[in-house]
């Protein structure tokens, strides 16, 4: 349950801080083009079977291209693109912090309500009941958010590589 909020907070931490200059963009794009040519060269394909190593290098190359495009938005609405990048980075931080809170609340509820016999405190059950008494669908909506977060955490944990070193 920790991979989703940690990934979101790290995505905020590793975001592009400012738009890079055109000279930096050209240099980085040239380096990426060289790496791309090395990956697709006929001699390399003959030396190696196009297996796991080449596919992994291709994935890393695609990640680097995406990071470069985020750091240097292009087109007619480059300013808008940069603003959207900044807003998405801030949203990742906010959802990461909220996700961290949900990741702490779920196990705490399991310990307080499920593992202790008799239950020490109704905790989330009481919260959902109180929200339902405030407005009919508020408790149901809060429960749906908790369940959706749990599913997204499981999917994030499944997709997250165990040893993400390049």
Swiss-Prot record:
GO cellular component terms given for this protein: plasma membrane
Chief localisation class: membrane
Membrane topology of this protein: Multi-pass membrane protein
Signal peptide (UniProt feature, chain positions): none
Pfam families reported in the protein's UniProt record: LMBR1 (PF04791)
Compartments where located: Cell membrane
Regions of this protein lying in the Extracellular compartment: 114-134
Keywords: Cell membrane, Membrane, Transmembrane, Transmembrane helix
UniProt keyword Translocase, yes or no: no
Transmembrane region(s): 93-113, 135-155
All ranges on the Cytoplasmic side of the membrane: 1-92, 156-166
PANTHER family: LIMR FAMILY PROTEIN DDB_G0283707-RELATED (PTHR31652:SF0)
Complex formation: Homodimer and heterodimers.
Family designation: Belongs to the Casparian strip membrane proteins (CASP) family.
Name of the molecule in the record: CASP-like protein SELMODRAFT_416721
Organism: Selaginella moellendorffii
